[in-house]
Amino acid sequence: MKVILASSNKGKIKEIEQMMHMDVIPYKELLGDLEIVEDGKSFKENAIIKAKTIYDALGDKEAVVISDDSGITVPILGDEPGIYSARYAGVGASDKENLYKLINRLKEKGIKRTPAYYTAAIAIASKYGIDTVHGWMWGEVIDEARGKKGFGYDPMFIPKGFDKTLGELDEEIKKSISHRAKALELAKIILKRWE
């Protein structure tokens, strides 16, 4: 089974390969700079848009495209950054720029620590149609970055039941509790049907 990943984010590619125990091909290796307009109103809609766009562009009925749309939501900030997590500080912004924009938004509001959650929506496009699964991780965000591990908003997110940020936790712990890991476990069940 040829599995194409609808991402060029190196951190996400590595994480998905490790969790799925399979090699994936980043879509840009096959399609270059294919334009994908993520104009959905939810993580699920954006994951479907990415998976379907890439699957259709490949023209290979035997290919399987896995797309993930994920992000962090902070209810007290009106659910920011939500579906805009990857471009919170602007289109083309780095993980660090997005992280510090959220930290600064908390500081502007005088918030040191508040509930937040990560969502991962995964869409799988194949000759069988499109399947979707979700995973969530609950916790809190803090107004500072702690730790060097992980990527994205990890240095400011403390998962429920822990006193360290994802940026401070060992990779194995993060993998066992993450929103993406939960969604990928469900995605594996779908993929096993086709083996």
Curated annotation (Swiss-Prot):
<dbReference type="GO" id="GO:0036222">
    <property type="term" value="F:XTP diphosphatase activity"/>
</dbReference>
<comment type="subunit">
    <text>Homodimer.</text>
</comment>
<dbReference type="InterPro" id="IPR020922">
    <property type="entry name" value="dITP/XTP_pyrophosphatase"/>
</dbReference>
<feature type="binding site">
    <location>
        <begin position="179"/>
        <end position="180"/>
    </location>
    <ligand>
        <name>substrate</name>
    </ligand>
</feature>
<feature type="binding site">
    <location>
        <position position="70"/>
    </location>
    <ligand>
        <name>substrate</name>
    </ligand>
</feature>
<keyword id="KW-0547">Nucleotide-binding</keyword>
<dbReference type="GO" id="GO:0005829">
    <property type="term" value="C:cytosol"/>
</dbReference>
<comment type="similarity">
    <text>Belongs to the HAM1 NTPase family.</text>
</comment>
<keyword id="KW-0546">Nucleotide metabolism</keyword>
<dbReference type="GO" id="GO:0036220">
    <property type="term" value="F:ITP diphosphatase activity"/>
</dbReference>
<dbReference type="GO" id="GO:0000166">
    <property type="term" value="F:nucleotide binding"/>
</dbReference>
<protein>
    <recommendedName>
        <fullName>dITP/XTP pyrophosphatase</fullName>
        <ecNumber>3.6.1.66</ecNumber>
    </recommendedName>
</protein>
<dbReference type="GO" id="GO:0046872">
    <property type="term" value="F:metal ion binding"/>
</dbReference>
<dbReference type="GO" id="GO:0035870">
    <property type="term" value="F:dITP diphosphatase activity"/>
</dbReference>
<feature type="binding site">
    <location>
        <position position="69"/>
    </location>
    <ligand>
        <name>Mg(2+)</name>
    </ligand>
</feature>
<feature type="binding site">
    <location>
        <position position="174"/>
    </location>
    <ligand>
        <name>substrate</name>
    </ligand>
</feature>
<dbReference type="GO" id="GO:0017111">
    <property type="term" value="F:ribonucleoside triphosphate phosphatase activity"/>
</dbReference>
<keyword id="KW-0479">Metal-binding</keyword>
<keyword id="KW-0378">Hydrolase</keyword>
<dbReference type="Pfam" id="PF01725">
    <property type="entry name" value="Ham1p_like"/>
</dbReference>
<dbReference type="InterPro" id="IPR002637">
    <property type="entry name" value="RdgB/HAM1"/>
</dbReference>
<feature type="binding site">
    <location>
        <begin position="7"/>
        <end position="12"/>
    </location>
    <ligand>
        <name>substrate</name>
    </ligand>
</feature>
<feature type="binding site">
    <location>
        <begin position="151"/>
        <end position="154"/>
    </location>
    <ligand>
        <name>substrate</name>
    </ligand>
</feature>
<dbReference type="GO" id="GO:0009117">
    <property type="term" value="P:nucleotide metabolic process"/>
</dbReference>
<comment type="function">
    <text>Pyrophosphatase that catalyzes the hydrolysis of nucleoside triphosphates to their monophosphate derivatives, with a high preference for the non-canonical purine nucleotides XTP (xanthosine triphosphate), dITP (deoxyinosine triphosphate) and ITP. Seems to function as a house-cleaning enzyme that removes non-canonical purine nucleotides from the nucleotide pool, thus preventing their incorporation into DNA/RNA and avoiding chromosomal lesions.</text>
</comment>
<dbReference type="GO" id="GO:0009146">
    <property type="term" value="P:purine nucleoside triphosphate catabolic process"/>
</dbReference>
<dbReference type="InterPro" id="IPR029001">
    <property type="entry name" value="ITPase-like_fam"/>
</dbReference>
<keyword id="KW-0460">Magnesium</keyword>
<feature type="active site" description="Proton acceptor">
    <location>
        <position position="69"/>
    </location>
</feature>
